[in-house]
């Protein structure tokens, strides 16, 4: 049971969340804890690309499970946009390091315009990329009226030969 207002990986147990989400959150904590504080700090200070973290995300389908709306989940009840689950995941990422939180947050921000659009093909593609372990991002700049993600439908294809990641 979690009784503290502060995150403690030793006692964290979000009892208000479904069992599969709890399993994923515990698996994430165990992944971080298995690295140890020393390695996490060294990786942060050396700005190490979190490739092993992204492999874990891909294997556990974290970014496919947490930020995918039910309508794009292909009938999988575990995949849903749920603010309580997403907040719990964000708290864990924030506790262990900015690089991990940043990969999550950039993905969430990149998904916003896609999920809000009426573009079914883009939604299906985003869901498929997330299921394949992709990390997404979105950037938009307009001279006329600023970055207006609500009224702009934009498709940014990856460079030739790049699968699942746009740079």
Residue ranges and their predicted role:
Residues 153-156:
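Hydrophobic/aromatic beta-strand elements that line small-molecule binding cavities or substrate pockets
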Residues 1-105, 112, 116-136, 144-147, ...:
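Amphipathic, small/basic residue-rich leader segments at the start of a protein or domain
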Residues 139:
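Active-site-proximal "nucleotidyltransferase
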């Amino acid at each position: 049971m979690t009784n503290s207002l502060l995150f403690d990986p030793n006692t964290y147990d979000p009892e208000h969340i479904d069992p599969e989400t709890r399993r994923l959150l515990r698996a994430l904590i165990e992944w971080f804890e298995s690295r140890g504080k020393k390695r996490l700090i060294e990786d942060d200070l050396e700005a190490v690309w979190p490739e092993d973290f992204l492999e874990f995300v891909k294997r556990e389908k974290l970014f496919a499970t947490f930020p995918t709306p039910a309508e794009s989940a292909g009938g999988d009840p575990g995949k849903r946009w749920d603010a309580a689950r997403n907040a719990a995941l964000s708290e864990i990422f924030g506790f262990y390091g900015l690089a991990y939180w940043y990969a999550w947050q950039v993905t969430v921000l990149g998904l916003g315009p896609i999920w809000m659009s009426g573009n079914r093909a883009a939604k299906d593609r985003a869901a498929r990329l997330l299921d394949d372990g992709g990390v997404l991002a979105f950037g938009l700049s307009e001279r006329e009226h600023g970055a207006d993600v609500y009224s702009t439908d934009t498709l940014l294809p990856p460079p030739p030969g790049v699968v699942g990641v746009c740079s």
